[in-house]
């Protein structure tokens, strides 16, 4: 009996928009509440004995056979909401507990769970990343021409200039998708747009059939990945320039899965199913849970595995639960897990105190009508109430703050913009928003409701000290506009989730960091205080923003190297990454101290070098099976991920997977092997350079790799041993090894945990 075991996905990542709502990931609701008597369940089943079901009608018939006979003959609204084909063997249905119990007794039933309701997590970057129109990777990849990027998000804004198809040919013949917008809305850029709303409708009765973006997040991420060139882009007069996505000539396929605050799991599963069926090349998922489940119960991991098997590259947000360790999500090794970094552009608003001190902060709203004269300065929390310090709604006394510059603290679960709205309601003239200690020097440029600036925690402490030092503190804000050239960029954003990787400690995560702070991209509607209703853009922050940067860059590599596997593209991105900032120093974090590998992974993406990496660490789909068996998963659990019946006849430790980085739990000595494939010059030679982690001896054999043809493979081994010379109290140490030729540097980070 040959069973095809596909478990339904607990669809991991959705997103929380990173604008005024801050950068923290929200709590995920564990299950939906459609009615008091029924819920939507994801049902996982096997295939029928001795049969291969490939046609949609056959699958639907099989799935319906699991329903109780009374439901089969019922004239009520159909109980089966979705029948899945590509990413799992199963269906979504609205059932009572009694009806579910009947389903569970059927032969072929595997498991079921209530669907989870998830919530969204949330111009200059091409130049910052070295992308130029007349040379380099853009030209070499033909700007991503012919590649299809599927974006699962909140929809799209058709007609926005970022989605113009000027100069873009029709989609390739393999495209099978459709456009559910009006006949003129889709074009050669926006080739597909669909809404998956059946679960949302069942839950709240709302009909939202059109894939129109109603809040901006989906439009922003889609244009970041593959927006067309748009001249004169700006936000309230700031960040002026030419806006463009990472792959400006790539096609976009939009799958709307979020309606209001709800992104139902079964709707997301249907969108993933469709994206694989439609023939996309890249899937971009700016979504995230607060904690990563094991891979066999991780919807993103399972869906991404199915996509990877078909040659589809999957890029996912790392999550916004930083800077805390072990907060990383989307940690499967077949996913590119993307953290967030700053760029070298700031939109500067300086807090100037009455004693002459100045502290640079950021704000998008910089009204020319604001006169920078010194005004009375007051701390919002002077009454000792925490809610006042956070400038919570209704917490400020109008008489105490009218006409003053008000110092508010970040946090309290209150959006940054909402704090400014409270200051404005109380009659305040301006706001200085100070960071909390956790976010330290990580700042966001927001469209505030009044003149404002967002300053660091250190600056806030000094401003508080000044307020306490005088009976008549004063301050103003100096708006300095857009400033390019911050030498500390790229730096890791405070909110960017960190490793270690809980589901698989032997795989270093995140894989890469990319631009995710104060990112300008398309927006559906004008912002408050905007006078231009035609060119609508907004600035957002989050790993939701860094993910589509890497999705677009992957599309460029796919265009340049159409025969590369998803693992080869991922390897090229990782081994070519930058580890120093524009000031030629090590990349720092929100504390301005050199960061560790759990924040950066391999480093910051460098598209030009990724397009010509020299060597790649390739992995074929079947190579993951012994790795998964080595995690201690049962054969059934591995089969859930692999979409077929599995025998764990062989298993390998995590470190033996042919991954472009090393994450080693080291007690006694360990030896791992790696195989690299030459994708550079046919005749080339690579020498070894090792920076061993403190307290670790690293031996590599051989120490020289010689190639005589393209696609030649060479294998090397690495032995890690403790030396006893390190700090006996340290838990982790880090280093790297790299293979260097006359043209290429192929770098792999090394993270060691002492056990």
From Swiss-Prot:
Active site: 153, 217, 544
UniProtKB keywords: Apoplast, Glycoprotein, Hydrolase, Protease, Secreted, Serine protease, Signal
Enzyme class: hydrolase
CC per GO annotation: apoplast; extracellular space
Domain (PA) ranges: 376-461
Pfam families according to UniProt: fn3_6, Inhibitor_I9, PA, Peptidase_S8
Molecular-function GO term, any one: serine-type endopeptidase activity
EC identifiers of the protein: 3.4.21.-
Leader sequence residues: 1-20
Lineage: superkingdom: Eukaryota
Localisation per UniProt entry: Secreted, Extracellular space, Apoplast
Glycosylation: residue positions: 182, 297, 325, 393, 468, 529, 706, 727
Family: Belongs to the peptidase S8 family.
Function according to Swiss-Prot or TrEMBL: Required for arbuscular mycorrhiza (AM) development during AM symbiosis with AM fungi (e.g. Glomeromycota intraradices).
Protein known as: Subtilisin-like protease 4
Organism of derivation: Lotus japonicus
Encoding gene (name): SBTM4
């Amino acid at each position: 009996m040959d069973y095809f075991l596909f478990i339904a996905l607990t669809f991991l990542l959705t997103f929380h928009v990173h604008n005024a709502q801050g950068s923290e990931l929200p709590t995920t609701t564990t299950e939906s509440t459609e009615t008091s008597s029924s819920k939507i369940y994801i049902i996982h089943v096997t295939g029928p004995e001795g049969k291969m079901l490939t046609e949609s009608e056959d699958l639907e018939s099989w799935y319906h056979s699991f329903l109780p006979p009374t439901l089969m003959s019922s004239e009520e609204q159909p109980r089966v909401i979705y029948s899945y084909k590509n990413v799992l063997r199963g269906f979504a249905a609205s059932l009572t507990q009694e009806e579910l119990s009947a389903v569970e007794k059927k032969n072929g039933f595997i498991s079921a769970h209530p669907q989870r309701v998830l919530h969204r997590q949330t111009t200059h970057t091409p130049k910052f990343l070295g992308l130029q129109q007349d040379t380099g990777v853009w030209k070499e990849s033909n700007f991503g021409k012919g590649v299809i990027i599927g974006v699962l998000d909140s929809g799209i804004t058709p007609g926005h200039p970022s989605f113009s198809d000027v100069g873009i040919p029709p989609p390739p013949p393999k495209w099978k998708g459709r456009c559910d917008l009006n006949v003129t809305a889709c074009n050669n850029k926006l080739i597909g747009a669909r809404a998956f709303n059946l679960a949302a409708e069942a839950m709240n009765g709302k009909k939202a059939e059109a894939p129109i973006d109603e809040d901006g997040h989906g439009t922003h991420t889609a244009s970041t990945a593959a927006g067309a060139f748009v001249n004169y882009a700006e936000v309230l007069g700031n960040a002026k320039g030419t806006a463009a996505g990472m792959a400006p000539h790539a096609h976009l396929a939009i799958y709307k899965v979020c309606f209001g605050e709800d992104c139902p799991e079964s709707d997301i599963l249907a969108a993933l199913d469709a994206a694989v069926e439609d023939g996309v090349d890249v899937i971009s998922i700016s979504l995230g849970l607060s904690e990563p489940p094991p891979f066999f119960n991780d919807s993103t991991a399972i869906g991404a595995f199915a996509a990877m098997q078909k040659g589809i590259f999957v890029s996912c947000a790392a999550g916004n639960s930083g800077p805390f360790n072990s907060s990383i999500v989307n940690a499967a090794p077949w996913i590119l897990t993307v953290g967030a970094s700053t760029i070298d552009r700031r939109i500067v608003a300086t807090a100037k105190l009455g004693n002459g001190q100045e502290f640079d902060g950021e704000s998008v709203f910089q009204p020319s009508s604001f006169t920078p004269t010194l005004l009375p300065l007051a701390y919002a929390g002077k009454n000792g109430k925490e809610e006042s310090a956070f400038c919570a709604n209704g917490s400020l006394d109008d008489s105490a703050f009218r006409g003053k510059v008000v110092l508010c603290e970040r946090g309290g679960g209150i959006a940054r913009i909402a704090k400014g709205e409270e200051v404005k309601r109380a009659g305040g003239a301006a706001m200085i928003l100070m960071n909390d200690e956790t976010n330290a020097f990580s700042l966001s440029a927001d469209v505030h409701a009044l003149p404002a600036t967002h300053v660091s925690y250190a600056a806030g402490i000094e401003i508080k000290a000044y307020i306490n030092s005088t009976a008549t503190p004063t301050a103003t804000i100096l708006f300095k506009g857009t400033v390019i050239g911050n030498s500390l960029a790229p730096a890791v954003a405070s909110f960017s989730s960190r490793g270690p990787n809980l589901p698989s400690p032997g795989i270093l995560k995140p894989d890469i960091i990319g631009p995710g702070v104060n990112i300008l991209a398309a927006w559906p509607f004008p912002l408050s205080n905007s006078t231009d209703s035609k060119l609508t853009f907004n600035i957002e922050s989050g790993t939701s923003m860094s993910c589509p940067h890497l999705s677009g860059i992957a599309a460029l590599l796919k265009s340049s190297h159409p025969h590369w596997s998803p693992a080869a593209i991922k390897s090229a991105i990782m081994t070519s990454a930058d580890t120093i900032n524009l000031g030629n120093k090590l990349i720092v974090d929100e504390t301005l101290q050199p960061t560790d590998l759990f924040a950066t992974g391999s480093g910051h993406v460098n598209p030009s070098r990724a397009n010509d990496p020299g060597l790649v660490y390739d992995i074929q789909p079947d190579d993951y099976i012994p790795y998964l068996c080595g995690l201690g998963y049962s054969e059934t659990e591995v089969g859930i991920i692999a979409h077929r019946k599995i025998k764990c006849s062989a298993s390998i430790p995590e470190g033996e997977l042919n991954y472009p980085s090393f994450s080693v739990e080291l007690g006694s000595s360990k030896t791992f092997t790696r195989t690299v494939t030459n994708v550079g010059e046919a005749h080339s030679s690579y020498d070894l350079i090792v920076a061993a982690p403190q307290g670790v001896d690293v031996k590599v054999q051989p120490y020289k790799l010689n190639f005589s043809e393209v696609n030649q493979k060479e294998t090397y081994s690495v032995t890690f041993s403790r030396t006893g010379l390190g700090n006996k109290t340290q838990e982790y140490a880090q280093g790297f090894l790299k293979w260097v030729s006359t043209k290429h540097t192929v770098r792999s980070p090394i993270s060691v945990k002492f056990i």
